[in-house]
UniProtKB/Swiss-Prot annotation:
Phylogenetic placement of the source organism: Archaea, Methanobacteriati, Methanobacteriota, Methanomada group, Methanococci
EC number per UniProt: 1.12.99.-
PANTHER family found in the cross-reference section: COENZYME F420-REDUCING HYDROGENASE, GAMMA SUBUNIT, F420-NON-REDUCING HYDROGENASE VHU SUBUNIT G
UniProt-listed InterPro entries: Hydrogenase_assoc-protein, NADH_UbQ_OxRdtase-like_20kDa, NiFe_Hase_small_N_sf
Species this protein is from: Methanocaldococcus jannaschii (strain ATCC 43067 / DSM 2661 / JAL-1 / JCM 10045 / NBRC 100440)
Assembly behavior: The F420-non-reducing hydrogenase vhu is composed of four subunits; VhuA, VhuD, VhuG and VhuU.
Protein name: F420-non-reducing hydrogenase vhu subunit G
Gene Ontology MF, one: oxidoreductase activity
Pfam families, per the entry: Oxidored_q6
Length: 288
């Protein structure tokens, strides 16, 4: 264990602050590592005016959505020894990445130019930074040293990464898939039809995918402990692709194709299969 405090920075770009909350969910475990951390930049808990030089580890939550995000990520890289993509939005684009299914102008016009009780029917220009054309993960702009996936990452994964760095080791990610962590019984059969999550009442012991629910545990990196399938909710792929996969959605589609015509019944396939990872997909935006 090192003796000098590590200078740490944290920031939320295009994200929801869920990764920061997951860090707090370490509870007493957080107290074990705090003495070795000097948090020098964290806008979510303080009001710093600028990013200081000489940061050892910078945890970046959120992807790149506007020009201000892009400016910050370059400054963070310049002033930090280690940059960690903290959570799925930073690593793969996350839920905001589904905006890539539309042109920037379409999104702005729908949100701001459609009259409602909440806006004046005009697109703000002075109050907010201009949007980039598409959402992108931070690795598209800078070198990322390590990734902690998840929406949000589990407190254990965050703790393991921090402790590894404090000990001078490299954080390691699970190499298995969610199905390997799932306690449900599998018979290795494909469903004859697919259901929406709210349809029917699944058998609490059988594999959700084999019951016809579009569970993506077979294509998603492990590490969550299969929390969603264990609770009766199909995996949606928030931990992203495995090391052996180039594209979570394409990998999932390839497996689903084995179900034949039943797979054609699945609605909104792009948003389902790349819900958290569209900006990182091989085809990651609306075609011109």
């Amino acid at each position: 264990m090192i003796t000098l405090a590590v200078k740490v920075g944290m920031i939320q770009l295009c994200g929801c602050s869920g990764c920061h909350i997951s860090l707090l969910d370490l509870h007493d475990k957080l107290l074990e590592v705090l003495p070795n951390l000097e948090i020098v930049y964290a806008p979510i808990i303080a009001d710093p005016k600028e990013i200081p030089e000489g940061i050892d580890v910078f945890l970046v939550e959120g992807g790149i959505r506007n020009e201000h995000d892009e400016h910050l990520i370059h400054e963070i890289r310049e002033k930090s020894k280690i940059v960690i993509a903290w959570g799925t939005c930073a690593a793969y684009g996350g839920i905001p990445g589904l905006g890539n299914l539309y042109k920037k102008e379409e999104l702005l016009n729908y949100v701001y130019s459609t009259d409602s009780t909440e806006n004046k029917g005009e697109i703000p220009s002075e109050e907010i930074p201009p949007l980039e054309e598409y959402v992108k993960p931070i690795k598209d702009f800078i070198k990322v040293d390590y990734t902690i996936p998840g929406c949000p990452p589990t407190p254990k994964m965050i703790a393991d990464a921090i402790i590894a760095l404090l000990n001078g080791e490299e954080p390691k990610l699970p190499t298995k898939i969610v199905c390997d962590e799932c306690p449900r019984k599998k018979e290795n059969v494909f469903p004859e039809t697919f259901k929406r999550t709210h349809e029917g009442r699944p058998d609490p012991e059988r594999c959700l995918f084999e019951q016809g629910y579009t569970c993506l545990g077979f294509a998603t990196r492990a590490g969550c402990g299969a929390k969603c399938p264990s609770a009766g909710v199909p995996c949606r792929g928030c931990f992203g692709k495995t090391d052996k996969s180039l594209d979570l959605g394409a990998n999932a589609a390839n497996v689903l194709a084995n179900a034949g015509e039943a797979a054609l019944e699945i609605p909104d396939k792009v948003a389902l299969l790349n819900r958290f990872t569209l900006p990182d997909a091989l085809i990651n935006r609306k075609a011109k």
